[in-house]
């Protein structure tokens, strides 16, 4: 599961978030998300596209819509994050039986680990899982 900051940073700014998206595009990893997460990805990417009009977000949004692994989180109500908006990432990871959430969000990173789900910064994820 990628939090919105990581997904959008991968599109607009490069660095480890971009490496993660490229690995996903090469099918080296799977991105798990919920409809609620996709809506947030789209909203934040749309906002940034006004600031960076040279970047076309539609191809990656279409790819994630088609090739992302969607998980139904309906009925789950995990309230653990300081910022309740971040709970959707925990819910998605738990429902999807994911091992990792990749996040730069301080509220999520404070948790470190929840119900078998590790929370890693993008650089740590790249170093631990994408380096050969």
Model-derived segments and their meaning:
Residues 54-65:
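Short, well-structured alpha-helical segments
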Residues 66-100, 106:
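Active-site neighborhoods of divalent-metal-dependent phosphate/nucleic-acid chemistry enzymes
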Residues 3-4, 33-34, 104-105, 121-122:
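A secondary-structure boundary/capping signal
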Residues 50-51:
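Membrane interface segments of multi-pass transport proteins and intramembrane proteases
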Residues 2, 14-46:
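PIN/NYN-family metal-dependent endoribonuclease catalytic core
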Residues 15, 32, 55, 80, ...:
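Residues at secondary-structure transition points
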Residues 96, 106-132:
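Acidic, PIN/NYN-like endoribonuclease modules and their adjacent C-terminal/linker elements
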């Amino acid at each position: 599961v990628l939090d919105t900051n990581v997904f959008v940073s991968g599109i607009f700014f490069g660095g480890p978030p971009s490496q993660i998206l490229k690995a996903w595009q090469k099918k080296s990893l799977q991105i798990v998300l919920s409809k609620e997460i996709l809506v947030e990805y789209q909203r934040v990417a749309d906002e940034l596209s006004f600031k960076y009009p040279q970047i076309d977000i539609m191809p990656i949004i279409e790819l994630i819509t088609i090739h992302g692994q969607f998980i139904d989180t309906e009925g789950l109500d995990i309230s653990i994050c300081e910022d309740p908006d971040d709970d959707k990432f925990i819910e998605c990871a738990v429902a999807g039986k994911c091992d990792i959430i990749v996040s730069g969000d301080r509220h999520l990173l404070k948790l470190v680990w929840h119900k078998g789900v590790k929370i890693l910064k993008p650089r740590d994820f790249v170093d631990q899982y994408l380096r050969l």
